[in-house]
Design a protein with these regions (language model features):
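Glycan-recognition and catalytic cores of secretory/periplasmic carbohydrate-active enzymes
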Residues: 1-421
Length: 421
């Protein structure tokens, strides 16, 4: 089964169009120099003495160890939006950013393109505590890969391919046990991007990287029917299993698909979910069928919602089971739509003392009496800020699917499909 998307699916739903346009406007509003600041700083291409006025705050400040992560999300979102609409303004902005990233890579010696120093990776290898450098670096790889996939920018692919050489050399110096220790520090979607690059380039080095990034300490217990997930940081594991899904699509090896099914069984089928579809508290998986005690102000992290929707859509394409489409529907309405680009619609016209709009809420509080906390446009940039711009980049995804016998309508939003049957 394949997903029907791109220009053949046109969204007519007014609310979805509002969200998509708000997302586009936000992507264009963010200054390219501020988006690039940490990359230029790392490459020695910033010559100022002070942090520029208007520089991004929150997780993008130059003292944050995850600085620079958002640009990868930005590139991915801009590329996805271009793939849906052919938006030339976003394309021009994205390509200018990619050109500057290529210059940063040259000044870094021809491989490194990260917004953080190489030593962060050496530190985690030595056991020094550092905040998820591979999670961070995956984001720019993802953005470059999506820029090639949706925009066709060959320079983006070249930059990503050369950056991969750094990881090939670095990861090759460790024993299996030592690298498993390194993989215990959140890696984001590195496995997925290696599968993407294997498909795009056909180079054997990506087969090597897929094997090195195989996280047996998570995957083996899942395959044995155990529960390694309860109280584990959820969004560490979901991107890793999305990597297995992508590896299966690219290689056709059943072992990858077995992991995906085992993960879904442990994470969803046996665990259950909140009425909204969410399953986390404080960023970790809640115990199976025992979620009441964990209700509070930090339920349903937006990143987990976005990534689990991606996993559900993969499984729907593989199986055609409507349960996966139902899971997606719960999380679209009660997660993606509930947690970003909020606008109040007053039925009475009465004034209220709560915000009439909001950009993004990291969590969805599920305990009675609590309220959402909305982020800033330029002073937050936590992880969910990135998945927000990706989730709202193109609302024509996940609506229609097709196999040899039928077309499947999976979400009942006002939309138009053009397809040859």
């Amino acid at each position: 089964m394949i997903e029907l998307k791109g220009k053949q699916v046109v969204v007519r739903d007014r609310e979805l169009k509002r969200r998509e346009e708000a997302n586009r406007s936000y992507l264009l509003k963010l200054d390219s120099e501020h988006l690039l600041f940490n990359y230029k700083l790392e490459a020695g291409r910033f010559s100022g003495r002070d942090i520029p006025e208007g520089a991004h705050g929150g997780w993008e400040t130059p003292v944050c160890q995850l600085r620079g992560h958002f640009l990868g999300h930005w590139l991915s979102a801009a590329a996805i939006h271009y793939g849906e609409t052919g938006d030339s303004e976003l394309k021009v902005k994205a390509e200018a950013i990619i050109n500057e990233l290529a210059e940063c890579q040259k000044d870094n010696g021809g491989q490194w393109i990260g917004p953080i120093p190489e030593k962060y990776l050496h530190w985690i290898a030595n056991g020094k505590e550092i905040w998820a450098p591979q999670y961070n670096l995956h984001k720019i790889l993802m953005g470059l890969v999506d820029s090639y996939r949706y925009i066709g920018n060959k320079k983006a692919l070249t930059v990503a391919d050369q950056f991969a050489d750094w990881f090939l050399e670095w990861s090759g110096q460790f024993t299996r046990e030592k690298f498993d220790d390194i993989l215990d520090v959140e890696t984001g979607g590195m496995l997925e991007v290696w599968a993407d690059l294997l498909e795009m380039t056909g180079k054997d080095k990506y087969k090597t990287l897929l094997e090195r990034y195989y996280r047996s300490r998570l995957f083996q217990p899942l395959l044995e029917g155990k529960d390694p997930l309860t109280n584990m940081h959820a969004n560490t594991t979901i991107p890793e299993v999305l990597g297995c899904a992508r590896a299966y699509e690219v290689t056709g090896e059943a072992r990858w698909l077995d992991i995906v099914h085992a993960y879904w069984n442990c994470a969803v089928t046996e665990r259950g979910c909140l009425v909204t579809g969410g399953q986390t508290a404080g960023e970790v998986w809640m115990p199976k069928m025992k979620m009441k005690s964990r209700l509070g102000d930090k339920n349903q992290e937006h990143c987990t919602v976005y990534n689990m929707i991606r996993l559900a859509e993969f499984l729907f394409r593989q199986t055609g089971d409507p349960a996966y489409a139902q899971y997606t529907e719960y999380n679209l309405y009660n997660g993606i739509m509930a947690q970003a680009y909020y606008r109040e619609y007053s039925l009475t016209g009465n004034k209220h003392n709560h915000p009439s709009d909001g950009l993004l809420t990291y969590f969805l509080p599920m305990k009675a009496g609590l309220r959402k906390e909305w982020s800033s446009e330029t002073d937050s940039f936590f992880c969910c800020h990135g998945t927000m711009v990706q989730a709202n980049a193109a609302w024509n995804r996940g609506l229609y699917y097709k196999d040899d016998d039928a077309i499947y309508v999976c979400q009942y939003f006002d939309s138009e499909l053009t397809v040859q049957v």
